[in-house]
Amino acid sequence: MMMTKQKPTLTERLNLGDEVRELKLGATFNPKNTSTAFHTIKYDFKPASVDTSRMATVDVGSNNQVTVTVPNLESSGVPHTVYKGNHKKYTKECLIIYDKETGVITLEKLNHNIQVKKTRSEMTNKPSLMPAANAGPLMSGANGGGPIPSSMMAAAGSGSGTAPKLENSTMRISSKTKVSTGSRRNNIIDFKPRNSPMQQSSPSRPVVSHRSPQSAPAWHANNAQQTLPSIPMITDDDDFGLNAALHNGGGHANISGSSTGSSSGQPDYVSSSHMGKQRQALPQGHAKRQQMTQQRSSPPMHHQQHQNQQQQQQNYGRVGGSSNYAQQQHQQQMQQQQQQHQQQQQRASFSHSNHSNSMPLDINSPSHHDHVTQSVAQAAAVLEQQIGGEPSASSSSSESDSSDTDSGSDSDDSTDDDRPTQQKQQNSATHQQQHHQMQQQHQQQQQHMHQLPNLGLGSISPAYNSHYQHQQQQQQPPQQHSHHHHQQQQQQQQQQQQSGIYASNGGFPNDLLQNDLQLSSNSSDDDDD
């Protein structure tokens, strides 16, 4: 059999040469053979201290259990190495045996496959010795090129002249085992002090803390309540810094969160105190409004008294026959009214500015102010017309006197003979205009009655009063301007007094406004009748 192209080749190792050789079948192929059998042994570890001068033993027990005992050198300290395993029968595997002396190549069948592993325990059973004739085929089978693995060894043999070199690893294994167990014990010893609470005061904790990072999380997980020595020091410093900052007012970085929390909490306290002050101010404003309602009933009475005084003075002037005295009285009253008008405008504007600064919660629009001022002016005009429109001789004479005084003050060329005709014309014109104004006021009051629920507390600005009065002045004819000049001044005085009173408080309640409008509507209905 030629085998080429191998490093090293079988022919080179066995010195077979290039010639062709015959292959013979061995005794195992004879069915009558009962003495010859070939087995293979596969082991996991080969000791270096095997004594090749002595024979090894193979013991086949029950349940296919096999025990192989290999002797060791005396200097190794271990008498022999023991292998244990099981065996299986071969079905188609064969073994080639080459004889170097004769050059004969023989083919034999394999009987059993034995696989063993090294054990630490030593066997005391007596081994059964293999025949000497089987040693040669076992060695050749181990070194042959057949399907048998190269790691097989023969149990015993003397014909080949060389025994298998088995290494003893008992001492090496034991030393490795000791090292491995020692390292495990060291790890356990290192791990236990980590979990023990007595290690908090031990000086070896920094060394333990420099272990692998895999063991550090386990230490934290097992010691959730325990902390490193540096962590309590940091928390103690934080507490000390926080207390010192709270007592001494120091701005450390550790108390930034608490300082920001306190600073953010101050606006809430300020806003709550501000709201409390506003709530306290509301009852005070309500009390002021009640006082103003009491004072509000006085302007019509004051206005009536003022008109009665004027009528008495004018009648006194007519009875005495001194028109100069009446003109002087009228001029003095006009000057006083102008002075009062200026003072009330200043007071109303000052109170309105104060109200706009002190009451930022006023949400009324200028349209509301227009409605309020118009309703107040209408109520005042209706009251004045009721007083001036009574069917009495004194009122008619007072109106004629006032018209005479007005016409006398405007033009000095008029005489006493022309006065009755002028008075009739002026009275008829004033009556028609008053009737027309009453109809307009009644329509406006009906329109404003729907808007009364929407009216709130609002300030009455003098600018709106002056605008409304200017509109009334433009609506009047030029020939009647001199006659109603005195009445308009009285209306302005009353409206400014009321607006000054209301502006000082910042507004007036809705129920008072409704009462005035109802009173004015009743008076307008009486006049229409």
Swiss-Prot record:
Keywords: Activator, Developmental protein, Nucleus, Phosphoprotein, Transcription, Transcription regulation. GO terms for biological process: cellular response to heat; positive regulation of DNA-templated transcription; transcription elongation by RNA polymerase II. Residues 401-416 have a biased composition (Acidic residues). Residues 194-215, 256-265, 306-315, 327-346, 431-451, 469-480, 488-499, 510-523 have a biased composition (Low complexity). The modification Phosphoserine is found at residue 196. GO terms for molecular function: transcription elongation factor activity. Residues 167-186, 347-359 have a biased composition (Polar residues). Residues 155-235, 253-529 are annotated as: Disordered. One of its GO terms (cellular component) is nucleoplasm. It comes from the Eukaryota. PANTHER family: ELL-ASSOCIATED FACTOR EAF. Promotes transcriptional elongation by Su(Tpl)/ELL. Essential for development. Belongs to the EAF family. This is Ell-associated factor Eaf. It comes from Drosophila grimshawi.
